[in-house]
Every structure is written in structure tokens, then in C-alpha cells.
């Protein structure tokens, strides 16, 4: 870049970009004197780890219970038959003003997309996709809005013919594990399999374990009777009903998680197993909140989730 405004690169800029189907790419963007785009010249890209030919990424909107339009991304084969049979993985987070934006994952591409699976990312309230107001709309007693948004996306996928409940799985970790824990306990009829990773699940005691006290502003204070009542409405451990039918569930956690205590996953898995439900639980003895200490362990944890979901959704 010519900082003096003269020379061949005076009206040019460097741009780094990525999406679900494109590895991170550095490009030179050339502009005319009025700032209008002349050309985008890709210069260097990270390696591709799967064949994206014939795959497309698109954005749709679902309507939540209160009428809010909720955006979500779908990555699928361009020639996908809309007959409701595609194994579909729905991912979400919905908390702490964190935005889920498009990004490239070689593991996802090789393990899921290349096999004909559909991948969906829901940009539900609680996240930061539309700024602070989008986050604040799902704080504390309004947490139900995040879960209603996610369920609305699940229903919209079925309505579009992309998938059906028996072929639709969900995955989320940490706050996203609380999300998928609520999908498991509040909306079991919408899903064929659920993956709950390093989750919060006991919202009555979360503030007493590890970093839990630092999240009171997000979820609510269990020591306040009014807020505890609200917390119990989205506490999967307390919402579990032994007499209800649930989809197969995989819990994953880490013994050395220093943020969300592994006891959350342990106690709901134990309660469900005692009730005779279809539960798989895996606890890595290394790694922190990410669940793995090495790349090999991370690959193993990812493979566990993809294998579990593929085996139950196809």
C-alpha cells in the first residue's frame, strides 16, 4: 500500500476473506479514484481440505415464537433433493454477544459435507450478529428466546424439505451445550440426535463451580429467588423427565475443564442412564475447556461427534 497516495497501489487495499467453502484467502483489491471496485486479485490462500465443487452456502430466515426473524446459514449440495431425508447438523451458540460468522473447516468438510450431509448455523438471539440489542434480548429471564429461535430454525429446515426430525441433529459446546441441553429436554420431538459438549446443565448450582460466578450477568443469580425461578425454566438437569421420550444424546466433557465443571455433563448423563435413556458419554482426562490437549485429541473428539450423529441420522 502506498501511504502517500501515489503510485500503482495508491487506490488498493489488502483483504482477507473466508467462508464455509473457501479457505482463508489474501487478495489485493483495486479501486478507482471514486472508491469504486475495479478488481479483486487473489494472491495467496490456505490449503483446501475438501472438494467444494457442487456445494453451495445460502442464508434463510425462520420466524420465532414472538415474530422475530432469525437468520441462519445452510451449506449443502446444490442438487440436494428436498425430500426431507438429508442428514443435517444444526449448530448454535447464542450467548455472550458472540457472532457465528462463516468460516472454513476442513474437518467439517471432510467428515460431513463430503458425505452428503447438510450443515446449518443458526444466528439466534443472545449472540452478537445484530449488535448489543440482539445479545440483550436473550439475557436472564428472556433466555427462552434463544431456545425458541433455535427451535424455529429446526422447524423451518423441515418445512423447506431440507430434512426431517429423524434426520436432524444438533451440536453445541459450553453455552452452546446449554443450548443443546435445552433442545434435548424442551424440544426432543424436533431432533434425531443431540450432541452436548462441555455444557452447563445445572443452572441452580452453576455459580458455585469454577468460573460460573462470572456468568451471573448473562444467566441470572441463583441466590436471588426470583432469578432462580427463571433459571430453573432453562436448566436441563431439572427439566429432564424420566417418563418422556428423548433422542439419543452424546455428552462430552474434560476432567480438567477449568471453566465449566465436568460435573454438569456427568450428573445429567447419570440421571438419564438411570432412566434407561440412550446416552453416550465421553470424558477426556486431558485438555481444558476446549476438551482436548493436542491436535490428535481434538480430531478424536470431533470424530466422536460426527460418527455419533452420522450413525443416528442416516
Regions found by a protein language model. Name each.
Residues 1-81, 98, 107-110, 114-115, ...:
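Non-catalytic accessory segments flanking enzyme active sites
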Residues 10, 23, 83-85, 165, ...:
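Short secondary-structure junction motifs
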Residues 18, 91-95, 174, 254-257:
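Glycine-rich His-Gly loop
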Residues 26, 62, 72, 90, ...:
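Conserved hydrophobic/aromatic pocket- or pore-lining residues that grip, position, or stack substrates
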Residues 56, 68, 86, 164-166, ...:
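Exposed loop/turn and edge beta-strand positions of beta-sandwich/beta-sheet ligand-binding modules
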Residues 81-87, 91-130:
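Short substrate-entry loop that stabilizes the transition state in hydrolases
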Residues 121-314:
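Active-site-proximal cap/loop segments of hydrolase catalytic domains
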